Amino acid sequence: MSDSTPPPGILRALADHTTMTLAYTDGDGPQACAVLYALRTGTEDGYEAGPGDPVPALLFVTSESTRHGRALSAAQPAAPVAFTAQRDGQDWSGLTGVQGRGVCRRLDGGERRRAWRMYADRFPYVALSPKLRGAMDHTAFWELRPTWLRLIDNSRGFGHKEEWGA
């Protein structure tokens, strides 16, 4: 399937989760890490999608001093990544999750401020904690733009898949 917006089931699954495993590669080889993300669907208050603006986008934070932060920075302006998002502790019959590929880019200026608002809406405790808020002021915000997504939903039949490509 190829359309500008992923099917509702894929968007719902991305909205239902808050943590993704982000896979990338650097000079030492492949690696993966877990990051919390906020989903931008293009319908948020104050957000106006422009022509060709990718929907959805996964917004996350990470320091550029981490291994994955260094790898993403080194591959700018569009670091290729793969990711998964699923809830822990599921059984086979009800397993749901999203697999994806895309590119990451660092957000600056107005884009960073908008990402911060969406992230704080998704994780209010971050904005309420002076310690976390201070850390966020000095941490890079990133946007993951999916180019391919696959929903796995065993509740609709073992191995049920729904795919989308940009």
Question: PLM ranges: what are they?
Answer:
Residues T66-H68, Q90, G157-G159:
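Short, surface-exposed beta-strand-loop junctions and turns on beta-sheet-rich folds
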Residues H17-S65, R70-L72, P80-R87, L95-G100:
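Short beta-strand segments
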Residues S2, G94-A166:
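Charged, gly/pro-rich active-site loop segments
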Residues D3-P8, S65-H68, Y125-S129:
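Charged, amphipathic alpha-helical segments
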Residues T21-T25, G89, V126-G134:
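Short helix-to-loop capping/linker segments positioned immediately adjacent to catalytic or ligand/cofactor-binding
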Residues M1-M20:
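Extreme N-terminal tail/first-helix region
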Residues M1-P7, E44-G52, A166:
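Short, low-complexity, intrinsically disordered N-terminal peptides in bacterial proteins
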